[in-house]
Amino acid sequence: MLFNINEKGEPLVISFAPFLSPEAIKYLQENERCSDQSQKRTAQQIEAIYTSGQNILVSASAGSGKTFVMVERILDKILRGVSIDRLFISTFTVKAATELRERIENKLYSQIAQTTDFQMKVYLTEQLQSLCQADIGTMDAFAQKVVSRYGYSIGISSQFRIMQDKAEQDVLKQEVFSKLFSEFMNQKEAPVFRALVKNFSGNCKDTSAFRELVYTCYSFSQSTENPKIWLQENFLSAAKTYQRLEDIPDHDIELLLLAMQDTANQLRDVTDMEDYGQLTKAGSRSAKYTKHLTIIEKLSDWVRDFKCLYGKAGLDRLIRDVTGLIPSGNDVTVSKVKYPVFKTLHQKLKQFRHLETILMYQKDCFPLLEQLQDFVLAFSEAYLAVKIQESAFEFSDIAHFAIKILEENTDIRQSYQQHYHEVMVDEYQDNNHMQERLLTLLSNGHNRFMVGDIKQSIYRFRQADPQIFNQKFRDYQKKTEQGKVILLKENFRSQSEVLNVSNAVFSHLMDESVGDALYDEQHQLIAGSHAQTVPYLDRRAQLLLYNSDKDDGNAPSDSEGISFSEVTIVAKEIIKLHNDKGVPFEDITLLVSSRTRNDIISHTFNQYGIPIVTDGGQQNYLKSVEVMVMLDTLRTINNPRNDYALVALLRSPMFAFDEDDLARIALQKDNELDKDCLYDKIQRAVIGRGAHPELIHDTLLGKLNIFLKTLKSWRRYAKLGSLYDLIWKIFNDRFYFDFVASQAKAEQAQANLYALALRANQFEKSGYKGLYRFIKMIDKVLETQNDLADVEVAAPKQAVNLMTIHKSKGLQFPYVFILNCDKRFSMTDIHKSFILNRQHGIGIKYLADIKGLLGETTLNSVKVSMETLPYQLNKQELRLATLSEQMRLLYVAMTRAEKKVYFIGKASKSKSQDITDPKKLGKLLSLALREQLLTFQDWLLAIADIFSTEDLYFDVRFIEDSDLTQESVGRLQTPQLLNPDDLKDNRQSETIARALDMLEAVSQLNANYEAAIHLPTVRTPSQLKVTYEPLLEPIGVDIIEKSSRSLSDFTLPHFSKKAKVEASHIGSALHQLMQVLPLSKPINQQTLLDALRGIDSNEEVKTALDLKKIESFFCDTSLGQFFQTYQKHLYREAPFAILKLDPISQEEYVLRGIIDAYFLFDDHIVLVDYKTDKYKQPIELKKRYQQQLELYAEALTQTYKLPVTKRYLVLMGGGKPEIVEV
């Protein structure tokens, strides 16, 4: 019951319906089942929405509508009188929180519109107003609220900021680490500490490996509910526990004995095969059979009588006996088929071998571990102290502060527990122990609602622990008084082709050992509607493998990057989908394991004209060319005597010094000085006092004067202005921001430069001032091998999506391609020198000196790296955890698809053979085989081979090179009658494009001030040509008339003919060829053909180029011969930018363009421009392009301070090349 006040001040009483009883819920489920609604809620969804008064764990499979359930449950709570601000709702991301809030808002609006009860309308309106203040967000956001409000109770100021930039964190960490390292090196136990550092770094001077160890231990501890207690009590847990053979866990010994018995059973099965050959021709037992029977009997006896024969104390003896008994190989061959009978046992023996020796030396490493524990504890405290001093914290710090506040202040904790009616959490499978502790403190013990899917837990690298979900699942199933488990199995996203293949694959792969969940009936996907079950034969899943038998590179299947052939397979399938089925590009998504090494995808797709967008977020910002140029510019301003930065700045497009210029400058040294920096040489070159002043010609001297004048102004400004203003001054002074707009990926490049200015501004606002400190911070980021995220730019909507599997979680796409299925899982962590585990603590590889054991006397020491017992335990658990997460990644990837899923990989067809698995457990592949297979592709092929008699709902196809030719792949169909890119791509058609633009704006140009408003910041020479010549001169009209078509011109297409090559493409190809053509060789057909291979055009365009005409230009014209004679003076395809004044608006703007060719001499310049326009009389083109060449000449004169004495047009659009002097 809720009270509101009406306009007269009288109380309004709202009576809310009570929460539903179990019987009422069953009644509602039955009504829903019998209803005639087109989309019905499932019985489990109804149960999840309306069950109350107890803890609830909802296990929601992919596409089962978990967000719908959460929204409906929240709305039901509100309608039953629970205010939205009394619900705690945790989401995994800020984006998810925003979407959930929007859905609740829409539901409330809908409910307000439907209700006729005035009092209810008022109440729902209040809920709508309270929605923005409700606790709907991430755990990090909530922790910040708690600390901001109650931080005073633990001595933390409410005025803090979050250090979201990893680079800033690493800079502070490095300072703390260096100081602490010096202290430990000078303490009483310094010898032990030095031994610790050497164990990981090899020597005390190189501390990088030891620093990584400390940082990793610190980060790992931060994911626990109490880092200090974990470091004190759990960090050395395994090191203290496992010191003798008797300490080895019973579970590990059971696994060894199980492997022995399995090997005996498997060997017996093999010997019982008909073709095995138990008897010789004489009828006696064969030697092989006798040997195998001995192995079977002894293994069985040793397993049965382990305790009396060996026991834990005699484990090393058992290992020696078994090693001596079984053969060194893994396989037993029967009828040319190899059965890996001994493989698993060999792996187990390797794990236990040398145990006695390891345990003997393991005790020596314990003092080192105690030193490490002390150092990490001291580092944690010192790092936190620095952050408290700066009042800047990481998210994990804030979460721990929040936990401490709630644990130490009973009244604060109880106020939250009494306030929240329910504590709800989404994506529960991705929680870590710190977050779990916080949720426990907020709950009253019986009001938690948790939604997740163990099969989609893929954030172990963020210390998420799927066992939190698993433990709750088991506890609630065993002890129903603790809570209730509700399974949402119906999938409303995917067609049966996707559901069937997902069920088929994971029913053979996933169990609690690998995957952390048994993929049985509880977890299998079920179609949620009849429409999803309608079969489509063409949507059957495909495993497409490039046959690498003829792969010249012989690249291994575990190579990191995807191959060109694999990408071509994808392109072929996409072209087929787009052309034959009309599938829009935006319906197709490519999923990859990581963001790195995917450039070949974009490059190949560009070749085939397939638009593609990536999910961004790559950590390559500081490595982008434009940012590196600017950073070197700033380094030079800070210290001109930094030769590396200075050379980079001189060579950059801002000043464009070439190798010859730099060589001339480098020779201007002072013979009296041993060391001479480049900046000093530049200054001597300018005043003519270098060692070889005759090498500094007037043009170079002019460039040097401009450079020194510009640098001087920048250095002066750096002392007075802000970093932000300095960066923009550099952009404006040298037009670098405009220059990158003419380069590849211009939008991204400009966004990166803009972000550099913003980040510099943010740096100064955070309390750091000055160019020197900014450069120092950037260099420290690079030293720690970190980077900053690229800036995201707006992406086209109609394009294929390329994203990581992690980024795709929660999304859905009609067609999904899972790429690089042959990429090996990253097992880097299990080979490190240390492995951390929440229960066992740290396990390390110990560098032991076994000189005494070997009786060695001549050598000072004999060092061997030993895997200590804690390390081995952690390694095995980590291996299974890694494989489990990879399996869940595959599940997430496959269940993103709505209609069809493709697997793309690479394998050798000739080397592939049938995979056998005699130890498979019913439907499951054996644990040994699943541990052995290390790619998605391996899993799929193993299932296809071993369960070949089943319908697995996917086909395996090998793709040959002959299937990937240009003709086989095909080309995209373009439905437009006219190519919309014609005007854009044709360098000679800018006149028409600009004229059409001006026709639309002609009325506005009549106003005096409109000219300034519409003046572009940047123009091209072609645009200017249009501005000042008659708008519709006869030539322009003639071109437009020729481009139009009448019905009488229309003819039926002749499909046997090839598509006509566009004139614009030929023009572009000609310019490329003229740019790359080597003029040092005689120009003939062979030279032209060789150069033609290096240009970026398709074969049709290359074939359409008239090479004889180009050869004639160089051989038969004086200008062509001039090119070859003075090639050292020639500059080709040179970009430029100059400042111009608009005559109408009197506003300045930047003029930029690309000059085809010019010859730079000591006292003059010769300008050349190629044109491919069709013409009747050369005089037509001379008039048309006269002003454009004048602009080019003006740009060259401004740059070099030299006159342009000759201007030539090379006309290639006629029957033969013609030269026109303008």
From Swiss-Prot:
Limits of the UvrD-like helicase ATP-binding domain: 39-495
Domain of life, per lineage: Bacteria
Highest classification ranks of the organism: Bacteria, Bacillati, Bacillota, Bacilli, Lactobacillales
Catalytic activity: Couples ATP hydrolysis with the unwinding of duplex DNA by translocating in the 3'-5' direction; ATP + H2O = ADP + phosphate + H(+)
GO MF terms, alphabetically ordered: 3'-5' DNA helicase activity; 3'-5' exonuclease activity; ATP binding; ATP hydrolysis activity; double-stranded DNA binding
Organism: Streptococcus pyogenes serotype M18 (strain MGAS8232)
Listed transmembrane segments: none
Cofactor(s) for this UniProt protein: Mg(2+)
PROSITE patterns assigned: UVRD_HELICASE_ATP_BIND, UVRD_HELICASE_CTER
Protein name: ATP-dependent helicase/nuclease subunit A
Subunit structure and binding partners: Heterodimer of AddA and AddB/RexB.
Task of the protein: The heterodimer acts as both an ATP-dependent DNA helicase and an ATP-dependent, dual-direction single-stranded exonuclease. Recognizes the chi site generating a DNA molecule suitable for the initiation of homologous recombination. The AddA nuclease domain is required for chi fragment generation; this subunit has the helicase and 3' -> 5' nuclease activities.
Cellular component terms (Gene Ontology): cytosol; DNA helicase complex
